[in-house]
From Swiss-Prot:
This is Lipid-A-disaccharide synthase. GO terms for biological process: lipid A biosynthetic process. Residues 225-627 are annotated as: Lipid-A-disaccharide synthase. Pathway: Bacterial outer membrane biogenesis; LPS lipid A biosynthesis. Keywords: Glycosyltransferase, Lipid A biosynthesis, Lipid biosynthesis, Lipid metabolism, Transferase. One of its GO terms (molecular function) is lipid-A-disaccharide synthase activity. It is an enzyme of class 2 (transferase).
């Protein structure tokens, strides 16, 4: 069809075409390995289309009619995959017409050449390296034609899958047929000594093997989940939430096996511990660093146990950084059960990109703050607002009027201080609190009581009171709600304690004296800039409690004292109490009970139950579980 010198000169077109095919399948393989499922990006079809156009040209130049014809048909299928998701989607009838015209136009030049040159070869063997190979016999040509036909049928299979599911994916049969056809064609072109096609079909075996390997590994997970729940809590607050969750699970499903990670409260409710929660209790950079290998070992133990047991639902309670690693690993290993995270990470304050992780890997997110629902209005993630556990705890609190007598506290009016639970927080915030109290108008008429989170902190508090020349007493943390109910006003460190004060309707001023390094991290690394920082103010979207947050240059004890003087006015205190009542009503609105929540979760199907793009119905019907 073309002069011999031109045939040899243009031979590299086939090599360039294979570079495009190779890049397309390398990209597809890379994304499939990354996501542990067969992914088909749009770029796959674009690069394959360019490769097909070049291979059609190669088929014409090298007088290889089957190559040109099959790649012409494939080109139409590539186009159909690109067109299926466009706004101008063509009908199936139009696509079939395009296919027929393409095949006709491809066959026409060969037909004309055969008419004028009856001795032309329909499948020439270039053998550009002049290897001493005898011409292949009829049986080799039959193997070659069978291989090429089978190999090309994979895209017709994919096309049928595309039209039936209206989704551009590569089903498992695509890879199986591609491997068989590619292997036969590979043998044929070795026999004929055609370097381009040896490279093309030899490299073409790799994507089929790689994707079949991914599918096989994924199919080892049973679609039928065992009637059990995995529940994990890594902190004391999570242990409290987990015990309540377990209590309701056992009420609904008494025979349900629950295993995982939990503390004493969860174990009392029947959790079968794989690891005790106390083993995760590490704090501080050095302690975490020295325990890193132990933590990794525990992490590996957990995800392997979950994959082996294959429970219906995985519940992860708070402790987000560890649980995110676990959740991502489970999904990447093919776990298709429901994953529920209890307590939304503070994405509204910092690291907002964590929202994408939640949406990508979870089925349901259980919320404890009312405004968090607004963060997921247009999200595919199912959210359920359970309410904050403190609301129930404080509503059930029974105030004992004789608590002051038990601690030998006089009936003098009280200003309460809640400087924090950590030694560093106590030293920084308590000094500001004491100086603000002494500078206020209440210093002469009120006594000062400091809530102590731990008995071992009492002496630190008393030493600081003495150093500042202030008389005061410590009150154990178990009496903190009594203290909140009976004080005229409180100074509280920004944190959960501020929400506790609001739910107890305690007139409060929020403070938080930060270290320079903390300020640097907040401003320049984590970029935490908010209109309010304490939960009562965030929830109500108004300033219930005055806030003094920052470094020593941002506020002074005298400014805090001025706020105390405002709260000395009964009208100001009453205004704060009314705002706290509004806060309580907000937090009690649209609350779903744990029992209703569990029923909803149980009724929903996991978003990850069936991976149509990887397994389709094949795995569901043909692959038996290995566990």
């Amino acid at each position: 069809m073309f002069p011999l010198y031109l045939v040899r000169l243009l031979y590299p077109i086939g090599l360039i075409a294979n570079l495009f095919f190779g890049f397309a399948f390398t990209l597809q393989w890379f994304l499939s390995e990354r996501h542990k499922r067969a992914c088909v990006p749009k770029a796959f079809w674009i690069f394959s289309s360019i490769g097909a156009i070049l291979m059609i040209a190669h088929g014409f130049i090298q007088s290889q009619f089957p190559i040109a014809l099959l790649h012409g048909a494939n080109l139409v299928i590539y186009f159909r995959n690109l067109n299926i998701s466009s706004s101008r989607k063509l009908s199936l009838k139009t696509t079939l017409i395009i296919l027929a015209v393409t095949l006709l136009l491809t066959a026409l030049p060969f037909a004309l050449e055969a008419y004028y040159h009856p001795n032309m070869q329909w499948m020439a063997s270039p053998n550009i390296f002049h290897l001493p190979l005898p011409p292949p016999n009829m049986y080799w040509h039959m193997i070659g034609c069978l291989g090429l036909f089978t190999f090309s049928c994979r895209f017709f299979i994919q096309w049928c899958h595309l039209e039936m599911n209206n989704q551009s994916t590569l089903p498992v049969l695509f890879w199986q047929v591609g491997f068989v056809g590619g292997f036969l064609a590979f043998l044929y072109f070795i026999r004929t000594g055609d370097p381009v096609n040896i490279l093309s079909y030899g490299c073409g075996l790799f994507p089929s093997i790689a994707n079949l390997r991914i599918i096989y590994k994924k199919s080892r997970l049973s679609e039928f989940h065992n009637p059990s729940y995995f529940i994990s809590a890594g902190e004391a607050s999570g242990d409290t939430l987990g015990s309540d969750l377990l209590r309701h699970i056992k009420a609904l499903h008494p025979d349900k096996r629950c295993f995982g990670v939990g503390g004493p409260l969860m174990r009392q409710e029947g959790l079968e511990p794989l690891i005790h929660m106390e083993e995760f209790q590490v704090s501080g950079f050095l302690e975490i660093l020295t325990s890193i290998f132990t933590l990794i070992k525990k992490y590996r133990k957990l995800y392997k146990a979950i994959l082996k047991e294959n429970p219906e639902i995985v519940f992860c309670i708070d402790f987000p950084d560890f649980h995110f690693f676990l959740i991502k690993k489970l999904r990447k290993c093919g776990y298709t059960g429901k994953i529920v995270h209890y307590v939304c990470p503070s994405i509204w304050a910092w690291r907002p990109k964590r929202k994408k992780i939640l949406e990508k890997y979870l089925d349901t997110l259980l919320l404890i703050l009312p405004f968090e629902n607004e963060l997921f209005i247009n999200s595919p993630l199912k959210t359920i607002y359970l309410g904050h556990p403190l609301v129930k705890t404080i509503s059930n609190f029974q105030h004992c009027p004789s608590w002051k007598q038990a601690l030998a506290i006089s009936d003098q009016p009280i200003v309460a201080l809640f400087p924090g639970s950590r030694p560093g927080d106590i030293l920084r915030n308590l000094q500001v609190h004491i100086r603000a109290f002494l500078a206020s108008s209440l210093a002469e008429s009120h006594q000062l009581l400091v809530s102590s989170y731990n008995l071992k902190h009492d002496q630190t508090i008393l030493d600081l009171l003495e150093k500042e020349g202030c008389c005061g007493k410590t009150v154990p943390a178990m009496y903190r709600y009594h203290l909140m109910r009976d004080c005229d006003c409180a100074l509280a460190k920004c944190g959960t304690i501020a929400l506790e004060a609001a739910l107890n309707q305690t007139p409060t001023i929020v403070t938080c004296l930060l270290r320079p390094f903390d300020i640097f991290l907040a401003k320049y690394i984590f970029k935490i800039f908010m209109s309010a920082y304490s939960l009562p103010n965030i929830i109500t979207k108004s300033i219930i409690f005055p806030e003094f947050i920052g470094g020593k240059s941002d506020f002074t004890p005298e400014e805090v004292a001025a706020a105390i003087d405002i709260l000395a006015n009964p009208k100001s205190r009453e205004k704060q109490k009314r705002a706290c009542q509004t806060l309580l009503e907000t937090m009690e609105t649209n609350v779903v009970t744990v029992q209703e929540c569990l029923q909803t979760i149980h009724s929903l199907k996991s978003r990850f139950h069936t991976e149509n793009d990887c397994l389709g119905n094949y795995v569901q019907k043909n692959v038996r579980p290995s566990f």
